[in-house]
Amino acid sequence: MVLEATMICIDNSEWMRNGDYSPSRFQAQADAVNLICGAKTQSNPENTVGVMTMAGKGVRVLVTPTSDLGKILACMHGLEVGAEANLAAAIQVAQLALKHRQNKRQQQRIIAFIGSPVKYDKKVLETIGKKLKKNNVALDIVDFGETDDDKPEKLEALISAVNSSDSSHIVHVPPGENALSDVLISTPIFTGEEGGSGFAASAAAAAATGAAGFEFDVDPNVDPELALALRLSMEEERARQEAIAKKAAEESSGAENKDHASSSNADSVMAEAEPASNAADDKKDQPKEDDDAQLLQQALAMSMEEGSSGAAAADAAMAEAAVDDQDLALALQMSVQDAGGSSQSDMSKVFEDRSFVTSILNSLPGVDPNDPSVKDLLASLHGQGEQEKKEDKSDKPEDEKK
């Protein structure tokens, strides 16, 4: 890759207002300048490019040789068109700018766009060419626009004077449908002395056409704020779309869950309905069994009524017998009293036997014979038994006395 420092001379004279090159001569020239600047900076990172004008209020350097492509492209905006181009003065100023380049190892090159008539004589141009050759400065000329009889001859003489080892080139571009930049892509002015590579050519073309190779079609070197704003806007839009897609997915999953829940509820209702129907069927089968049970209960009730009526009749008969025979009634009463007294005496004897009572209490569930309350109860019963014995003993002597 050739290491170069290049100065591009732009023709911004009144002749650039014509529209024989689409959209105008000046705009076509600006597109071609952008193309060449991109090609130079892309072919070698250390290459530098400067831009200057040849008309207007005078020759003026817009940008000194630099590798900042954004700065180079930005200087093309807002240029004024007017007056006449001064080719000789422009070449001399460009030579001085290249002489003061920072990297002295860079080769020097001047590219001049000439779209207006050339007013200088051939001898003057040859003198300028020899001076460039002496200082090892290469010259490329793009001839377009006005075509008088002397212009091509003068420019050819200039290139012949400066040419050394075919390092200088001239390209004549007639008016036509093809853009000026499209014609220059296939020329040595664009590809360089080594012919260039396809990668460098495509990258340079993308960079020079203003943004074809940049994201959002905006060169961040020219307008970094706009490029950042577009990038942020794109990220926000992407995040918004992702949020919408996520929400839609959640809603669809929620609807599926609701459908599943409703189907499960329906299944549970069906499951509950089946036992209910089975219970109804069981109830239909139960009336026969219930009727049999009712009949049995009625029979038992009748038998109990008969038994109670028989007992009542027996009691009535006994009552009548008692009335008829008072002596028998008195005997019965005395026997009952004797039986009651004997039973009470028997019960008192049983409670007097503490070992027997303790064994009975041990056999009862949940009863503790050692409980204080149980002991107090047994003691009270035992005391009552002893008191009854004393009363019986006291009653016997009185009976004997009688």
Curated annotation (Swiss-Prot):
GO process annotations (BP): proteasome-mediated ubiquitin-dependent protein catabolic process
GO molecular function, one term: polyubiquitin modification-dependent protein binding
Keyword presence, Repeat: yes
Sequence ranges assigned to domain VWFA in this UniProt record: 5-189
Record flagged with keyword Iron: no
Biased composition (Basic and acidic residues): 241-261, 385-402
InterPro entries attached to this UniProt entry: PSMD4 (IPR027040), PSMD4_RAZUL-like (IPR049590), UIM_dom (IPR003903), VWF_A (IPR002035), vWFA_dom_sf (IPR036465)
CDD domains, per the entry: PSMD4_RAZUL (cd22297), VWA_26S_proteasome_subunit (cd01452)
Cellular component terms (Gene Ontology): cytosol; nucleus; proteasome regulatory particle, base subcomplex
Keywords: Proteasome, Repeat
Region described as Disordered: spans on this chain: 241-292, 302-321, 363-402
Family label: Belongs to the proteasome subunit S5A family.
Record note on quaternary structure: Component of the 19S regulatory particle (RP/PA700) base subcomplex of the 26S proteasome. The 26S proteasome is composed of a core protease (CP), known as the 20S proteasome, capped at one or both ends by the 19S regulatory particle (RP/PA700). The RP/PA700 complex is composed of at least 17 different subunits in two subcomplexes, the base and the lid, which form the portions proximal and distal to the 20S proteolytic core, respectively. Interacts with PI4KG4.
Listed name of the protein: 26S proteasome non-ATPase regulatory subunit 4 homolog
Organism of origin: Oryza sativa subsp. japonica (Rice)
